[in-house]
């Protein structure tokens, strides 16, 4: 059976088209509002994080790595005579995310401390093989940090309350840390050290950026917004101005905008599934370059809609005495919508099963009482992938019936497809809101 599958819904529901319009418009309106909220929330959150980083950069060091200065005596008493290019490992018992980028060549691992509510003054000095010098200072909540880069060839690590020092040989980066007293009290066991080591700068820049999954959802929301905006405009024009809806220019314009947004939505959903799968099996955040995702998602969507400008791809079909529908050729619909939809649905289903299997093994080893495991399961397993599967399963069923049985699907399935497929942005935003709420409880 050839032709546009949507003509089936128009023919079957010619006496009840109001239900199709209402289901489609209702789902699109929910998605439109939800995607706007998601996009605005993401941008505001990113702005606040960037502003907070500019004003108080040390708070991101607090989240990055901590230094227990109670280990200082152990280092000094261990008889270490020089601080060579091999760093001294200082463990922290209070932080589970104590992971810095691996060192290269002769770069020493910096010591970064967390200090809560302490009015402390920190001073650091570092030198490199060159004769250049620089300075850095930051002030926040009564705490001041000062960074200088004089010309030195030796490094010492000292504490104001104990004359413990560690001499250093010539290395690429040489750091001096002094921990003074304040108001008769010691500064405390956790103190922050700023340095000019490139790994730390890169880590701090990454720390102030939103989570990668949030960024992926942001771009998914943009593609949803493009699609639902086209759907809403189309429905309103069909209802209030039927003359415009009969023109071929209108058909091409609204089909391009809707199809571009829907294709981009499928590809961004595939990228999210890929990211969650990699992060789950590696048990750590997966470092990605978003430029590749942009090329795949937006590029493939552009290729998909480019052929719509060729002749005989889109035609205006007359429905029931004066009504019209912008019909797409069956071959185009098969290759540029049905096949990508089936592939995306299968890929997301495979990722769902693999992640579910992985977490079943983890729960079997560590027990289901682990709060962290429960949170990860809720976040990664139950929302983003399920949102995709639930919303697009009706489209898959209807296209399967249309292609393999050669007949129009039941009208009730069309109602479900019109609502869920146009409401995909709403369910994505709902998943984003729920996971963000769980983040705040962690």
Curated annotation (Swiss-Prot):
Query: For the region Disordered, what residue ranges are annotated?
Result: 83-166
As recorded in Swiss-Prot or TrEMBL, the protein's gene is named crlB
Q: What ranges does the record list as Polar residues composition bias?
A: 112-122, 145-166
| Residue spans crossing the bilayer | 17-37, 220-240, 256-276, 290-310, 335-355, 383-403, 411-431
Report what the protein is called. Answer: Cyclic AMP receptor-like protein B
Give a GO cellular-component term: plasma membrane
- Membrane topology designation: Multi-pass membrane protein
Source domain of life is Eukaryota
The annotated regions of Low complexity compositional bias extend over: 91-103, 123-144
UniProt GO MF annotations: cAMP binding; cAMP receptor activity; G protein-coupled receptor activity
- List the keywords (alphabetical): G-protein coupled receptor, Membrane, Receptor, Transducer, Transmembrane, Transmembrane helix
Q: What is the stated purpose of this protein?
A: Receptor for cAMP.
- The scientific name of the source species is Dictyostelium discoideum
Q: Which GO terms describe its biological process?
A: adenylate cyclase-activating G protein-coupled receptor signaling pathway
What is the annotated localization of this protein? Membrane
Cytoplasmic face of the membrane: 38-219, 277-289, 356-382, 432-442
Q: Which family does the record claim for this protein?
A: Belongs to the G-protein coupled receptor 5 family.
Please give the residue ranges for the topological domain Extracellular.
1-16, 241-255, 311-334, 404-410
Entry's PROSITE patterns? G_PROTEIN_RECEP_F2_4
